Amino acid sequence: MNQTYGRLVSRAAIAATAMASALLLIKILAWWYTGSVSILAALVDSLVDIAASLTNLLVVRYSLQPADDEHTFGHGKAESLAALAQSMFISGSALFLFLTSIQNLIKPTPMNDPGVGIGVTVIALICTIILVTFQRWVVRKTQSQAVRADMLHYQSDVMMNGAILIALGLSWYGWHRADALFALGIGIYILYSALRMGYEAVQSLLDRALPDAERQEIIDIVTSWPGVSGAHDLRTRQSGPTRFIQIHLEMEDNLPLVQAHFVADQVEQAILRRFPGSDVIIHQDPCSVVPREGRKFELV
């Protein structure tokens, strides 16, 4: 699993970096020729794309390193740090767009030949849609937080390019403030995406529990297993591609230790079949030592 995960995530990061670099060159020429503030917004966003995707590429490779003596749980948290760094990059570009857009609203500047800008934006839109489609497939296969953050970033680019097309079309017909208005709206959306991305990264760094649906699946697996009378203290978190799952099983007092170990091992294998690559720790408790109120699951 780790080899497949590493290959897919690395390819997604390389594809994003290459795409952003190519689009940056095209947008520089288009902005120089047209003077459009919307294209300038897209140009700045491409600079941020390159910085973010390069950060992703380096961090993902680091996060895939195996656990060592100093990092016994692995290096998966590096993905969350990459997502947090991306949110900072994106917030900076959004603030730049705010300032540039307000300046052009106050003093609008007609652009040269909007047709060139429209052509460039159509190319950028098509390329970005292709990239997002590939990233979505990688996220579905790997659940990588770093690639998901990158995908959210490029999804905002799709919306941005669509808005730029409308703005350039309106400017072509003489409404020059449309360019700045749409750039301002794009900046607001980008800032919202950045804040959401940063929130998710911080939650991961704080060891937020797995989603309710996944925890419920773990509960269903454990409670349906023969020989398990109950369970409690389910604790979960995720670091990179690895889920960490801890749970206490309640078993009959007179169950031999060997049999208790066998049941716990079978439960562990069942959880691993559902969540491959997880780190599962199971503790066995005699029913008599578990308080009555502890017989139910406590989702921690």
Curated annotation (Swiss-Prot):
Q: Which reaction does it catalyse?
A: Zn(2+)(in) + H(+)(out) = Zn(2+)(out) + H(+)(in); Cd(2+)(in) + H(+)(out) = Cd(2+)(out) + H(+)(in); Fe(2+)(in) + H(+)(out) = Fe(2+)(out) + H(+)(in)
Biological-process GO terms, alphabetical: intracellular zinc ion homeostasis
**Topology relative to the membrane:** Multi-pass membrane protein
Q: Work out whether the entry's keyword set contains ATP-binding.
A: no
Q: Which residues cross the membrane?
A: 24-44, 82-102, 114-134, 156-176, 178-198
Q: Where can this protein be found?
A: Cell inner membrane
- Where does it mainly reside? membrane
The residues the record assigns to binding Zn(2+) are 45, 49, 153, 157
Q: Extract the GO molecular function terms from the UniProt entry.
A: cadmium ion transmembrane transporter activity; ferrous iron transmembrane transporter activity; metal ion binding; zinc efflux antiporter activity
What Pfam families does the database record attribute to this sequence? Cation_efflux (PF01545), ZT_dimer (PF16916)
Q: Which domain of life is it from?
A: Bacteria
Q: Which UniProt keywords apply?
A: Cell inner membrane, Cell membrane, Ion transport, Iron, Iron transport, Membrane, Metal-binding, Transmembrane, Transmembrane helix, Transport, Zinc, Zinc transport
Cited InterPro entries: Cation_efflux, Cation_efflux_CTD, Cation_efflux_CTD_sf, Cation_efflux_FieF, Cation_efflux_TMD_sf, CDF_Transporter
Of the GO CC terms on this record, one is: plasma membrane
Family label: Belongs to the cation diffusion facilitator (CDF) transporter (TC 2.A.4) family. FieF subfamily.
Quaternary structure (record): Homodimer.
This chain's function reads: Divalent metal cation transporter which exports Zn(2+), Cd(2+) and possibly Fe(2+). May be involved in zinc and iron detoxification by efflux.
| Protein name per Swiss-Prot or TrEMBL | Cation-efflux pump FieF
Q: Which organism is it from?
A: Salmonella paratyphi A (strain AKU_12601)
